[in-house]
Structures are given as structure tokens and as C-alpha cells.
């Protein structure tokens, strides 16, 4: 068994007992990256020297009896999360050479834990996309089948964890950007409640929807990482002051008698038969564990996708107005006057999908159309929130498929934005309502992973992790991606 194939909690045990050093663990992962990265293209930047320095710091912490849960554990950070002194590009030409002067709060918290940062992961440009094909630099491949996408926008982080390039990774989720790639790559991915994890240092896409969360190899690891990154931050005005529990303490609670809601709206048109069957079998596992399965309905979820794309694009058009080439970011070499400089810099710096969403958002916010689009989308948002509140009066969690399909072929949907947007049909409603949700692997369809989404009430991450852990223990998903080869 190679060190790089171990989980966070397995590595933690070995490190704390001093059976291996953080430097040995780090070298194992760096070798793994050299072996598989040319095949999957998950990383924008590899920070080898910094990683080895951090490993020495971790070994000192362990030697001095100061070890924490994540001391010496290697991580990869999505490249829209600020890392001081390390290039943060958002996979865009606009920020190709941007080096932040500060760390995001989540990065600061992880560094205080003693983690080892191995590099930054590829994403759809400015986190806009569902396949990681919109990156200005490279297309990340799915470790299960190199001709397929890993999902998006956090496809680099998901592929890196699936391929054992890191013990865990951070991503961001605006409409499914952690859960959908986790589903397509066969790993665990969690989007916490809006406000639980600080957004300070996350490059904004849609500020009322964005949330940072972890990708891990199992549910226990997810709870450990959430312990480290969750909690109030005065630097983020949307961060919520609540007492933070130890999320690992929920894992082993019995789920007998728990009410699990199944909404027919999450099994509608567009779902692949293989995905539907796999998820239905997964729901049967909960029944066997003594949980009560309850049919529920969330009717307004049907309108979640159009509402999401109006709200997210409107917020993006406002957030991305700051990239004008003056203070930082790409600046055009040839221009006639100030206005031409703005236009040319933005034209050259942004990719097609980003431009599409800026135009969509600007249109939705324009005076003649504000009421017809943006205002109406906000009303739908309220109706969706109310739907979930009513549903949670009858059940404790809601389960269903994370994605309507398994990983699709690279290039299959690039010329059909609507087909691409439909990849998020089961995930966007969770962001619209600000709820927490997790995707865990629940089987294979056509040899590719299928994700089960578990949605909870606001700040009920403990319950979600409990249900996910119970399933993981009962089902034991142990399939591994074969397309990348190597010792596992």
C-alpha cells in the first residue's frame, strides 16, 4: 500500500505515531503527481519546494507534541482561492500572472493546522462551467476514463483526489461545483451551509451562492477537514456566528428511525436509466439500515436552473467588473484610449463562457428587463427556500442523484450551453436555498461513478455526515479509477 493512496485519518495515525514522517508522505505525493499529472492535467501550479518546506514544519510540530488533525497532510487548493505568494489564476488569462499578497481564511486555517500545500488545481474559468473545459490553460481529464470530463467547475480538485495526487482538496460550489465533479470522479464532496465556511479570499463569482468545501477520499476525512475550515470569520460579512461542533462525533450515530425524504423532482426527465437504478438501490440500503423512506415534493425546484443562471450571471457581471487591467490582471498592449483599453483588455482576458455570463447578467439587470428577469428569479428563490422548509418538516434529510448522468465525453457539450447547464439540474437548488449537501459515491453505471446527494437543513452538517457515513460503511464503495494506472 503506497502512502499516497491512504486517507487523511490513516495518514494522521501513522504521522502521530511517527511511523512515517511528513517529508516521506509529501515525497510520495509529489512522485505520484509526476506519474499521473501528464495524463489528467488536474493542476495549474505545482509547489514542490514550498511543499517540502511545509513538510519540515509539520515534522517539527509532530516532534514537539504540537500535532493537529491535519499536520503533515498534503492538500491541493482550487485556483480561485487566494494563496499568499502562490499564483492564483482562476484558470483565466485575465489573472494568469496574479500572485495574491494574502491568504484566504480557509488557507490560513489549514496552514495553522500544519498542512502541506502541493499546488493549485485547474477549474472552469472563474468557476463558470460544469466540465473544466472552460479553463484558459488545459482541459482536465477524468481519472476513470481519460476521454471524459471530471465535471466542474472544481474538476481539477476532484480529479486530483480521485487520482491520489493529494489526500484532500478544497473546491468552491456556486451551483454544484463541488458535488457534481465529486459524483463524476467517485469521491466525497461537500458544500457546507452558506456562511459556515469563510469566503474571505475566494475570488467571487456569485457572492450569494459561493461556498468553499472539501473533496476527500471518505466521509471521515470530510468531517476532519470541515472541523478545520468551518467557523466564524470577522473578515467575511456573510460568515455566521454559531457554535461549531466536532463533526467527527456525529459519524457513528445510529440512523435507525431517521426520516429520509425522496423527492420525485430529482428523478425527472433527463436522468440516465443507469444513474436512476444505482441511486434507487442506494436508497434501499438506508431502508435496510432501519431508516424510514418518505416521499416528498419540492415543486418549485423545477424552476431552480433558470433562476440560478439569472441570479449567478447577474452577480458575476457585477463581480467581474473589477477586472479592467489597471491595478492587476491582463492589460492590452495596443489600444487607442481608456475605453478601448478596458474593452480590449477584457476581450482578450476573458474566455467565451465568462463573456456569455457577463452579457446574460448585464441584460438581466438592465432597467428594461430587471423586473422580468432578476426580480422574478429572486421571487423563485424564495419559493424554493419555502419548498425545502416544508419538506424538512416531514423528513430529516433529502436524498437523490447528484448528477443526472455519469461523466460525459470531452467536447460533447461544449457547443451546447443548455446541455452543459443541465449537468447542474439537481445541485443548483441547494445553493439557491443556502443549504448544506454532500455527494458520496454509491455505485457504478457503465463502469463510471454515480454520486448520491444528501441534503440537510441549515447548519445540519453533522446529520448529513452521519447519514453519509452509515451508507459508506454499509455499501463499501471500493472501486478505483483504472485509466491512470500505477500502484494503489
UniProtKB/Swiss-Prot annotation:
The upper taxonomy is: Bacteria, Bacillati, Bacillota, Clostridia, Thermoanaerobacterales
* Subunit relationships: Heterotrimer of A, B and C subunits.
Q: Which UniProt keywords apply?
A: ATP-binding, Ligase, Nucleotide-binding, Protein biosynthesis
Q: Which PROSITE patterns does this entry report, sorted A to Z?
A: AMIDASES
Organism field: Caldanaerobacter subterraneus subsp. tengcongensis (strain DSM 15242 / JCM 11007 / NBRC 100824 / MB4)
Concerning Pfam families, the annotation shows: Amidase
Quote the EC number: 6.3.5.7
Q: Which residues form the active site?
A: 78 (charge relay system), 153 (charge relay system), 177 (acyl-ester intermediate)
**Does the keyword Ribosomal protein feature in the UniProt annotation?**
no
Checking HAMAP family in the record gives: GatA
Concerning InterPro entries, the annotation shows: Amidase, Amidase_CS, Amidase_dom, AS_sf, GatA
Segment forming the signal sequence: none
| A GO-annotated cellular component | glutamyl-tRNA(Gln) amidotransferase complex
Q: What is this protein called?
A: Glutamyl-tRNA(Gln) amidotransferase subunit A
Question: Which domain of life, per UniProt?
Answer: Bacteria
Q: Which GO terms describe its molecular function?
A: ATP binding; glutaminyl-tRNA synthase (glutamine-hydrolyzing) activity
Catalytic reactions on record: L-glutamyl-tRNA(Gln) + L-glutamine + ATP + H2O = L-glutaminyl-tRNA(Gln) + L-glutamate + ADP + phosphate + H(+)
Broad enzyme group: ligase
**Is Protein biosynthesis included in the keywords of this UniProt record?**
yes
State the family it belongs to: Belongs to the amidase family. GatA subfamily.
Amino acid at each position: 500500500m503506497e502512502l499516497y493512496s491512504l486517507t487523511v485519518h490513516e495518514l494522521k495515525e501513522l504521522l502521530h505515531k511517527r511511523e512515517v514522517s511528513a517529508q516521506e508522505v509529501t515525497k510520495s505525493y509529489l512522485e505520484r503527481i509526476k506519474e499521473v499529472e501528464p495524463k489528467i492535467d488536474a493542476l495549474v501550479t505545482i509547489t514542490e519546494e514550498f511543499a517540502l518546506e511545509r513538510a519540515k514544519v509539520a515534522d517539527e510540530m509532530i516532534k514537539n507534541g504540537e500535532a493537529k488533525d491535519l499536520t503533515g497532510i498534503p492538500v491541493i487548493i482550487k485556483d480561485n482561492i487566494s494563496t499568499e505568494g502562490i499564483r492564483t489564476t482562476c484558470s483565466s488569462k485575465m489573472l494568469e500572472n496574479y500572485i495574491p499578497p494574502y491568504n484566504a481564511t480557509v488557507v490560513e486555517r489549514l496552514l495553522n493546522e500544519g498542512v502541506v500545500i502541493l499546488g493549485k488545481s485547474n477549474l472552469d474559468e472563474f468557476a463558470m462551467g460544469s466540465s473544466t473545459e472552460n479553463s484558459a490553460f488545459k482541459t482536465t481529464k477524468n481519472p476513470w476514463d481519460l476521454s471524459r470530463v471530471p465535471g466542474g467547475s472544481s474538476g481539477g480538485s476532484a480529479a486530483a483526489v480521485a487520482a491520489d495526487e493529494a489526500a484532500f482538496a478544497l473546491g468552491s460550489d456556486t451551483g454544484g461545483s463541488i458535488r457534481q465533479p465529486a459524483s463524476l470522479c467517485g469521491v466525497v464532496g461537500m458544500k457546507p451551509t452558506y456562511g459556515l465556511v469563510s469566503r474571505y479570499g475566494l475570488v467571487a463569482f456569485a457572492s450569494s451562492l459561493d461556498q468553499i468545501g472539501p473533496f476527500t477520499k471518505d466521509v471521515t476525512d470530510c468531517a476532519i477537514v470541515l472541523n478545520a475550515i468551518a467557523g466564524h470569520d470577522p473578515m467575511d460579512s456573510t460568515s455566521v456566528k454559531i457554535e461549531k461542533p466536532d463533526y467527527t462525533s456525529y459519524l457513528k450515530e445510529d440512523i435507525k428511525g431517521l426520516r429520509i425524504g425522496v423527492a420525485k423532482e430529482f428523478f425527472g426527465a433527463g436522468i440516465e436509466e443507469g444513474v436512476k437504478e444505482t441511486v434507487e438501490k442506494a436508497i434501499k440500503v438506508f431502508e435496510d439500515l432501519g431508516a424510514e423512506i418518505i416521499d416528498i415534493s419540492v415543486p418549485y425546484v423545477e424552476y431552480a436552473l433558470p433562476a440560478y443562471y439569472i441570479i449567478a450571471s447577474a452577480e458575476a457581471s457585477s463581480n467581474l467588473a473589477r477586472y479592467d487591467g489597471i491595478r492587476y490582471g491582463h492589460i492590452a498592449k495596443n489600444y487607442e484610449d481608456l475605453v478601448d483599453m478596458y474593452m480590449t483588455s477584457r476581450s482578450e482576458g476573458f474566455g467565451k463562457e465568462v463573456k456569455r455570463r457577463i452579457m446574460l447578467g448585464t441584460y438581466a439587470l438592465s432597467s428594461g428587463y430587471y423586473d422580468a428577469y432578476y426580480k422574478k428569479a429572486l421571487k423563485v428563490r424564495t419559493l424554493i427556500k419555502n419548498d425545502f422548509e416544508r419538506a424538512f418538516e416531514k423528513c430529516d434529510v433529502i436524498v437523490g442523484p447528484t448528477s443526472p448522468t455519469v461523466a460525459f465525453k470531452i467536447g460533447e457539450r461544449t457547443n451546447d450551453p443548455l446541455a452543459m447547464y443541465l449537468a447542474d439540474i439537481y445541485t443548483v437548488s441547494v445553493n439557491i436555498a443556502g443549504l448544506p449537501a454532500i455527494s458520496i459515491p454509491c455505485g457504478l453505471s457503465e463502469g463510471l461513478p454515480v454520486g448520491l446527494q444528501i441534503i440537510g437543513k441549515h447548519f445540519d452538517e453533522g446529520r448529513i455526515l452521519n447519514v453519509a457515513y452509515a451508507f459508506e460503511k454499509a455499501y463499501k464503495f471500493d472501486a478505483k479509477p483504472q485509466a491512470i494506472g500505477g500502484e494503489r
